């Protein structure tokens, strides 16, 4: 489905129950019927965006599972510069794809990016701002916390 650095693809078909043997990447415990996903600061994972609806599971959060080979875990605030950068790398996030329910993104939209795409943009000097409380802890397997903090909109 999505083996690249974040090319947009329709979400996986997900039932209301976790698949047999499915474990969240951060090893969260089930509590109150929800997985205890954590953000990069160690707190509970907060929503990223419901409009447009984002997330690997299209649940508004940057949660992940074993099928998410792109690791869509960084809650980023889109900028024109980043959207142009992404398109130049073959990932057009601007053009609507109604057949997949994708509205196309514009500056100031929040979106769960692939951690490797954010890191690539960081290294190119055009990384978008991030929402740390909504960025999944699994992003730390690709991105440095110090770099994410330097681009955070939710640190005082």
Identify the residue ranges that each predicted region occupies.
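Short, basic/aromatic beta-hairpin or loop at an interaction surface
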Residues: 77-92
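Short alpha-helix capping/helix-loop boundary micro-motifs
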Residues: 94-101
